[in-house]
C-alpha cells in the first residue's frame, strides 16, 4: 500500500496566540516571497539551494526571505501530512454543534474540550444557526456513535449536534493561495 505523505509549512500553529483564520494585518509579499511560500507549501523539504533555484533568487536572498517570512508569522511550523485511511481513520464527519450558553466561560470550556480530543482535527466558531463546525476523523460509524453519544453530547456546554458523513473527499489541500 502506497502512503502519500507531504511536508509543508503550515499557516498558524496549535497553541499560538493567533490561530489560523484569525484576522490580522496581512504581510506585504512581493512576487518572490509569494513563489517561496507557494513552493514551501508544496514541498517543505526543499533545501535552500533548491528553493532558491525554484523561485529564481540567490541562496543568500532566499534564506533571508524565508527567515523574514518566519519572523512575520507567514511561515510557521513544518509538519508531515498523513493519509487518514492508512492509519485507520478514514471516516470524515462534519459535526455542527449548538451550545447551551454563549457565555465566554462556556465557549472557553468547550474549546478546551475540543483541543483535548485528538479525533477532532479542525474546529471553527461559526455564525448562524450552529455555534461550531467540527471536522472529526474516526475509524467507523460505531466509533463516531460512541464519541457523539458518550463524549460530545455528554459535555455540559453542548445542547445539540448534527452530523454529516463524507462519502468521499473530492478536494483536499493545505496550500493557501498567495
Across the structure, where does each feature detected by a protein language model lie?
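A compositional/biophysical signature of low hydrophobicity enriched in polar/charged and small residues
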Residues: 1-178
Amino acid at each position: 500500500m502506497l502512503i502519500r505523505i507531504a511536508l509543508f509549512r503550515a499557516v498558524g500553529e496549535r497553541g499560538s496566540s493567533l490561530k489560523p483564520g484569525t484576522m490580522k494585518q496581512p504581510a506585504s509579499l512581493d512576487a518572490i516571497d509569494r513563489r517561496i511560500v507557494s513552493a514551501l507549501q508544496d514541498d517543505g523539504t526543499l533545501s535552500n539551494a533548491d528553493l532558491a533555484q525554484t523561485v529564481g533568487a540567490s541562496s543568500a536572498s532566499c534564506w533571508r526571505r524565508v527567515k523574514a517570512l518566519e519572523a512575520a508569522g507567514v511561515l510557521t511550523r513544518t509538519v508531515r501530512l498523513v493519509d487518514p485511511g492508512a492509519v485507520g481513520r478514514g471516516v470524515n464527519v462534519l459535526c455542527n454543534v449548538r451550545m447551551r450558553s454563549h457565555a465566554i466561560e462556556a465557549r472557553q470550556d468547550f474549546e478546551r474540550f475540543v483541543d483535548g480530543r485528538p479525533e477532532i482535527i479542525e474546529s471553527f466558531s461559526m455564525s448562524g444557526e450552529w455555534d461550531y463546525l467540527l471536522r472529526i476523523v474516526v475509524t467507523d460509524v460505531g466509533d463516531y456513535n460512541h464519541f457523539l453519544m458518550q463524549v460530545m453530547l455528554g459535555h455540559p456546554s453542548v445542547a445539540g449536534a448534527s452530523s454529516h458523513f463524507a462519502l468521499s473527499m473530492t478536494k483536499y489541500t493545505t496550500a493557501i493561495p498567495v
